Amino acid sequence: MIESNHVVLWNRCLEVIKDNVPETTYNTWFAPIVPLKYEDKTLIVQIPSQFFYEILEEKFVDLLRKTLYKAIGEGTKLMYNVMVDKTSIPNQTVNLEASNRSTAVTPKSIVGGNKAPSFLKAPAVQDLDPHLNPNYNFENFIEGYSNKLSRSVAEAVAQNPAGTAFNPLFLYGASGVGKTHLANAIGTKIKELYADKRVLYVSAHLFQVQYTDSVRNNTTNDFINFYQTIDVLIIDDIQEFAGVTKTQNTFFHIFNHLHQNGKQLILTSDRAPVLLQGMEERLLTRFKWGMVAELEKPTVELRKNILRNKIHRDGLQFPPEVIDYIAENVNESVRDLEGIVIAIMARSTIFNKEIDLDLAQHIVHGVVHNETKAVTIDDILKVVCKHFDLEASAIHTKSRKREVVQARQIAMYLAKNYTDFSTSKIGKFIGNKDHATVLHACKTVKGQLEVDKSFQAEVQEIESLLKKKA
């Protein structure tokens, strides 16, 4: 047998596969595979993406193994060369004889969970894991009108950390619009350009867990000293510091030290600084020292581009009308769009269905209409402020104007009824009030609802708007 004749060998395999799978499955998962080389009883093939690899391993591993043995010979191995997405691990090898999960190259795992760095001694730059996700970079961040400003500012920071006026850089926007992607992209680019920089990405939740552990273990000074050695600190979901006074106080000192020593800070949040309740004023002031940039929900055109990019990276093909339909009907977040693509591919594969408009409508209808969005305090504040024609910040002031007081009390009452937050938390988020103030507000609103029909109609109107948002 001529080992270099990889094309002939793969064509033999395709003939076997054609007889064992429906045409749609063959065209989707096997036709795009390109044979590269055959040597040492190993067939190397090129596949379009990591996603492709995962589907082949999960759904077709037995078929591939049997096909290789039948068409080429017992003990034949298959090696995948993953293409398209530059962040994928190339040359993933799967020994199909031994296990459908054994790989010759083990990807470096992205550190997550509650693993904390050692605070007793700051590791050298080369030993410090930045906790960045390499799949989030500028190359695969799709730009549109809704995120153009944030993208431009982020790139400027990455090119010259702590050397621009954008320090700190505060990125905010709804869930799933790309804040975490952009924050990671900044860190990844800085590591590429400045290998000697100590870059660290950490979620606000993990920072809080680490701080609590340091208090318990009497190592708080080590915790602070470690963070003060960082050159570029990225804190994701900073709103989670709300109401946690001691964590805020510790972060305040870390922030000051880093900023005063010419280090870059990047913060993300689901809301603008002006709407961050339960946060110390001195921190809020510092959040606004540099650049505050919003990532808005993606426009229809941007959603289409995101879908095309996702489909291309995964080595898939969707009809244009399917892409248009998804983009026009799934409008909450990028994460939702990518989830729909995966759901469509899964259903297409499992049930051997063509990817067409009917399939897309079935999937989208199930996701969009069965989704019950929880009402948040932010939702309540937006609806109440709009109803009373108030600025969003007014409700958080100490104003005793009748309309402000009434709006604040109604917001507290609705938050008590529509969310799972305690009265103390509600008070922190709405005007930074205490538990007793919230109880008094709820009692006042409830009492007025019982005797005032016009007030009752007003609250019902606000509630109906809230339910529409949900």
UniProtKB/Swiss-Prot annotation:
Record's keyword terms, sorted: ATP-binding, Cytoplasm, DNA replication, DNA-binding, Lipid-binding, Nucleotide-binding
Superkingdom per UniProt: Bacteria
Q: Does the keyword Mitochondrion apply?
A: no
Q: Where in the cell is it found?
A: Cytoplasm
Using the UniProt annotation, give all residue ranges assigned to the region (Domain II).
89-130
What residue spans carry the region label Domain IV, binds dsDNA? 349-470
- Molecular function (GO) terms listed? ATP binding; ATP hydrolysis activity; DNA replication origin binding; lipid binding
**Residues covered by region (Domain III, AAA+ region):** 131-348
Q: Which Gene3D superfamilies match?
A: 1.10.1750.10, 1.10.8.60, 3.30.300.180, P-loop containing nucleotide triphosphate hydrolases
Q: Does the keyword DNA-binding apply?
A: yes
GO biological process terms, semicolon-separated: DNA replication; DNA replication initiation; regulation of DNA replication
SMART domains, alphabetized: AAA (SM00382), Bac_DnaA_C (SM00760)
Q: Which Pfam families match?
A: Bac_DnaA, Bac_DnaA_C, DnaA_N
Which InterPro entries does the annotation name?
Answer: AAA+_ATPase (IPR003593), Chromosome_initiator_DnaA (IPR001957), Chromosome_initiator_DnaA-like (IPR020591), Chromosome_initiator_DnaA_CS (IPR018312), DnaA_C (IPR013159), DnaA_dom (IPR013317), DnaA_N_dom (IPR024633), DnaA_N_sf (IPR038454)
Q: What function does this protein fulfil?
A: Plays an essential role in the initiation and regulation of chromosomal replication. ATP-DnaA binds to the origin of replication (oriC) to initiate formation of the DNA replication initiation complex once per cell cycle. Binds the DnaA box (a 9 base pair repeat at the origin) and separates the double-stranded (ds)DNA. Forms a right-handed helical filament on oriC DNA; dsDNA binds to the exterior of the filament while single-stranded (ss)DNA is stabiized in the filament's interior.
Belongs to which family?
Belongs to the DnaA family.
**Binding partners and assembly:** Oligomerizes as a right-handed, spiral filament on DNA at oriC.
Q: What is known of its domains?
A: Domain I is involved in oligomerization and binding regulators, domain II is flexibile and of varying length in different bacteria, domain III forms the AAA+ region, while domain IV binds dsDNA.
- Please identify the protein, giving its name as recorded: Chromosomal replication initiator protein DnaA
Q: Which organism is it from?
A: Bacteroides thetaiotaomicron (strain ATCC 29148 / DSM 2079 / JCM 5827 / CCUG 10774 / NCTC 10582 / VPI-5482 / E50)
